Design a protein with these regions (language model features):
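Long helical/loop segments within the catalytic core of UDP-sugar-dependent glycosyltransferases
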Residues: 2-76, 80-82, 124, 131, ...
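Catalytic donor-sugar/metal-binding loop of nucleotide-sugar-dependent glycosyltransferases
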Residues: 81, 90-109
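Active-site-adjacent helix/loop segment of glycosyltransferases
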Residues: 118-168
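Catalytic core of nucleotide-sugar-dependent glycosyltransferases
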Residues: 38-45, 120-140, 200-203, 232-237
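Membrane-proximal soluble regions of multi-pass membrane proteins
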Residues: 122-133, 217-257
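Membrane-embedded multi-pass helical conduit in multi-pass membrane proteins
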Residues: 155-240
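C-terminal catalytic/acceptor-binding lobe
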Residues: 88, 104-130
Length: 258
């Protein structure tokens, strides 16, 4: 009921599409499920909150959003054809100048995978879907002049440019010579990344999650979870996921809504 009340508050304030805050239903089921919970918190902190404060759209995901009937009437119904319907619908809203509002007090709980291999398959599908949306919607968004459309265009361009970024990074390391590939330099780089990621994860866990929902194994493994996005994104550029496969969710005995 809290989700419906807070969503209705946003509609009464003038929002047409509302995205609530998402948490893992089973954050202590495994380190993988706990990493999803941390990822959602980080995404809200660094993506949704700044965009909400700046008058831009937050990002829809498949769980926990609501839309006004007039939006479907304006867009001619729900017309999505990619593997990432949420991203495609977000792009359609941006093209039409419809802002997606963020309501952090409208909370939904989503059961997450507990195995890393399953997580890789799910996130590969997400990455592939966003690439599909980009190839479908970028030409249309580039012809729009509004801030919402340009912000979405930048979001969809990011995965398209991932291979270029990886090549430029590799080229810069080659130009730096042997010093860039020395064991000491590689170890220092890896240590800095790991400390930064675990530090962020620990802060998110302590600040945003009560003691009963804290999974410290997830904090230790969060750098691996985040690093795995890059190969998944690169793979999605060259190997499309076109068939939906069921993602097992088997953490039902570890639900914690505290």
């Amino acid at each position: 009921m809290q989700y419906l009340r807070r969503t209705n508050d946003a509609f009464c304030a003038g929002a047409q599409v509302v995205k609530g805050r998402q948490m893992a239903m089973n954050p202590k089921a495994s380190w993988v499920a706990g990493c999803y919970d941390l990822y959602f918190s980080a995404f809200d902190l660094f993506f949704n909150r700044p965009r909400a404060n700046g008058g831009l759209s937050c990002k829809l995901v498949g769980t926990g959003f609501a839309l006004h009937q007039t939006v479907l009437e304006q867009l001619g119904g729900w017309n999505t054809q990619t593997m990432a319907e949420d991203a495609e619908f977000s792009a359609q809203c941006a093209r039409a100048g419809i802002r997606i509002g963020w309501q952090p007090e409208a909370i939904t709980y989503d059961e997450e995978p507990v195995e890393f291999a399953v997580s890789l398959r799910q996130r590969k599908r997400w990455c592939s879907g966003v690439v599909q949306v980009g190839r479908r919607m970028l030409p249309e968004l580039s012809r729009c002049s509004g801030r919402l459309a340009w912000d979405m265009l930048c979001f969809l361009l990011t995965p398209q440019l991932a291979p270029v970024s990886a090549l430029l990074m590799a080229f810069s390391q080659l130009c730096a010579g042997n010093a860039a590939f020395s064991p000491a330099a590689l170890a220092a780089s890896a240590a800095g990344y790991w400390i930064g990621c675990t530090g962020l994860a620990a802060c998110l866990l302590l600040i945003e999650r009560p003691a009963g929902r804290r999974n410290w194994r997830a904090v230790a493994m969060f750098p691996l979870f985040m690093a795995s996005w890059l190969p998944l994104q690169l793979l999605a550029m060259f190997h499309r996921t076109t068939v939906w496969r069921e993602i097992p969710h088997t953490g039902g005995k570890n639900h914690d809504f505290a």
